[in-house]
A protein has these predicted regions:
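Active-site loop segments of alpha/beta catalytic cores
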Residues: 1-113
């Protein structure tokens, strides 16, 4: 419907909670990239990457928690999706009480990859 209004800018679609249909969504929807939520399996993201770029899917709760578990998940995402096309991002919004140190932790981790 957005295209019917004359919008021509690139769009990232977010089929939240529908990992089972993510490939179909990527194939059939007029978006230029697909945002994936935190429940999306890494293998599904890889299959969607073969169709369109993806964005996501770090868990905001893990960002809040920080520590070694956060590093492990960042590493998993980079290993699975880092060859691209992929935009590193959260799976759904940053929580207001996330310590800035945890955001810095992620940025350093990604920068080291």
């Amino acid at each position: 419907r957005v295209r019917d209004l004359g919008v021509t800018v690139p769009l990232i679609g977010f089929p939240r909670g529908s990992a089972a249909l993510a490939e179909r969504y990527a194939s059939e929807c007029d978006v230029q990239a697909v945002a994936l939520d935190t429940a999306c399996p890494l293998a599904v993201g890889q299959r969607v990457q073969a169709i369109k770029p993806i964005q996501g899917a770090l868990d905001p709760l893990l960002l809040r928690a920080g520590g070694a578990a956060l590093d492990r998940r960042v590493d998993q995402l980079v290993e699975a999706w880092g060859a691209g096309p992929w935009i590193f991002n959260l799976g759904h919004g940053i929580l207001p009480d996330v310590p800035i140190a945890h955001v810095e932790q992620v940025l350093k981790r990604i920068g080291a990859q």
